[in-house]
From Swiss-Prot:
CDD domains xrefs: Virgaviridae_RdRp
Organism: Barley stripe mosaic virus
Broadest EC class assigned to this enzyme: transferase
Main location: host cell
Comment field (misc): The genome of this virus consists of three linear, positive, single-stranded RNAs encapsidated in separate virions designated RNA-alpha, RNA-beta and RNA-gamma. Three proteins (alpha-A, beta-A and gamma-A) are translated directly from these genomic RNAs and the remaining proteins encoded on RNA-beta (beta-B, beta-C and beta-D) and RNA-gamma (gamma-B) are expressed via three subgenomic messenger RNAs.
Protein name: RNA-directed RNA polymerase
InterPro entries, per database record: DNA/RNA_pol_sf, RNA-dep_RNA_pol_alsuvir, RNA-dir_pol_PSvirus, Virgaviridae_RdRp
Classification of source organism: Viruses, Riboviria, Orthornavirae, Kitrinoviricota, Alsuviricetes
Amino acid sequence: MDVVKKFAVMSVTVVAGPVLTLSSPVVVTFGTSLIAVSLVKRLLQEQPRVIAHDHEHYPGGSESSSSSCATAPILRNLSRDQCDSENIGCSSSACSPSEIVKVTRQVVEVERGLYRDKQQFGMDVVKKFAVMSVTVVAGPVLTLSSPVVVTFGTSLIAVSLVKRLLQEQPRVIAHDHEHYPGGSESSSSSCATAPILRNLSRDQCDSENIGCSSSACSPSEIVKVTRQVVEVERGLYRDIFQDNEIPSVMEEKLQKLLYSEGEKIRRRCQFEASTMHSRKVKVPEVGTIPDIQTWFDATFPGNSVRFSDFDGYTVATEDINMDVQDCRLKFGKTFRPYEFKESLKPVLRTAMPEKRQGSLIESVLAFRKRNLAAPRLQGALNEWHTIENVLKKALKVFFFEDLIDRTDHCTYESALRWWDKQSVTARAQLVADQRRLCDVDFTTYNFMIKNDVKPKLDLTPQVEYAALQTVVYPDKIVNAFFGPIIKEINERIIRALRPHVVFNSRMTADELNETVAFLTPHKYRALEIDFSKFDKSKTGLHIKAVIGLYKLFGLDGLLKVLWEKSQYQTYVKDRNFGLEAYLLYQQKSGNCDTYGSNTWSAALALLDCLPLEDAHFCVFGGDDSLILFDQGYIISDPCRQLAGTWNLECKVFDFKYPAFCGKFLLCIDGKYQFVPDAAKFITKLGRTDVRDVEVLSEIYISINDNYKSYKDFKVLDALDKALVDRYRSPYSAISALVSLCYHIFDFNKFKLLFNCEGKFVDKKLRKDFEW
């Protein structure tokens, strides 16, 4: 019999005597899976299997006695030789009605290679989903002790063919041929004609040996012809839990294919993991430079028309009156006249300060406005008690205590790793310095000023001459002494941090975005802290707290004593312009632990003043920090305690779109990511110290690396809202952002921002490159 396509009809034909009892339901399960199950589990306990086929012999074949025709064409395509080879044998011995032939048959049809046990079933799997049919012919004492189960295909639907054969009224189904069950007018006869598939023709029935029996029977012995045909469409719900004989081994396999929904099973695919993919939206390639200038003028009115070209010249050549104390000036140093240098002229007019030239006046101005203007804490404070409490809290909130490493950190390997990171110039200086440890002065530092001025994103550049940043740094040999140890300690700290606490240590844009990937896309209350004069406001409390933290990770002995001594009372010298001064405490901005010490000073101070144990996310980097709490979480203002205990002046920002290290934290397509501040970027495009096309090419390479997120219009749309929220722009910045992207990602357009006519120079950026 041909296979019914599309799994339309699954059938079992049971022809039985008058006392046939089914002790369990007859069940057909079919679909596309999987498991080999016996068709007749145990028909009679430990009875031999005798299977008849459509060849010469039939079991129980005697014309003169009560006979039974166990004609069960199980497999249509089996030849006589195949039957013999498979031990599907024939028996011609006569049997009485009480010794009726027991017919059992196990048929398992699966696709190649899933679940099959040849030794158990004794025959090969029939390929191509051959016929699923069973004909059971039994005598009056036949009892089925187990259900008849058929499992085939690969999809999983369970259908009950015969729920209770004798408890329910059986259906007698005739077909459209000559014979009908009980088919004689004058006598009671039985025609065991039960076509498995309703569309079988007469020739098909004959060829399949679904034959008719014409032997006379009394009315009480009329053969009951039952036929159950179940047509299953691709249904969504089938209740299989009431069928107790469903093998337990199927459960694990079923759960991978089916989606459970209460007590039902939905036939659909279940994925063990899902990934949400969001495509980028291309930014329109349109825009002009006036679009950018118009938005900047509207957001920072007056900044673009200020004239500061001669500010540095005025400071260097005219008299300066100011009060200075606690310092010494030496006027015998080299005098350098002010120089006007040629450079490219930017098209955009912004408040980007000009690059300064070093001089004694600039050093004194910077030293007075920076180092001598730090606040001084008035009042008594139990530093040891404060440090002990904050470190205990840090162990619970910031770190996994079992990951804290206190082993020896001064090893050859750690020193070699630090040495490999040094530049060729630094290595040459270290080799040339032959001083012994006892000859090194750990308390004397060098002093210098940075020529680059940080741009301010407000209106103060119109009225203020910004002070330069000061750098206090030790000799190279001092950094070489502490560098490997501090580097190893910071690596241990990072390894022990909890996942929601982030130390932004030289992270790339992609690495920083990975730290916020776990955040769910609902709103948080963001706490953004802005410290003023952070480095210069440090006291002994900060230094002792950081050293106490480093002690937890192995800093001890002579290294601890020398490091502590080098941070307290120091003497600074400007060897170029003759400025000398004593400094008490303060963070030395040029030693090997400037960034790490600033980071952990801020983190420990905020931990002491804020409930960081309830925070969802904390990120610290230098004097910048960002903390996320639940929306609506009530937080008291920490500025008073920070000033009274930690000597820190601060402002707390509560913007709708928080920022960290010059980047906005934005939720885009349900995922949080850091996006660079476009207002600061536009301000930098007005710089006047770009010398030539080679420097411009370096800037272009850096922009393409740091601002690649701008290539997605969805990012620009979210960034537009953040700019309006923070800078109170009178209108949307989307036109300026689109114009900005149009010019910065193509060098031929980018050079128009600086009136440059040269060609792009491809080169590798220096590790310390900043613009």
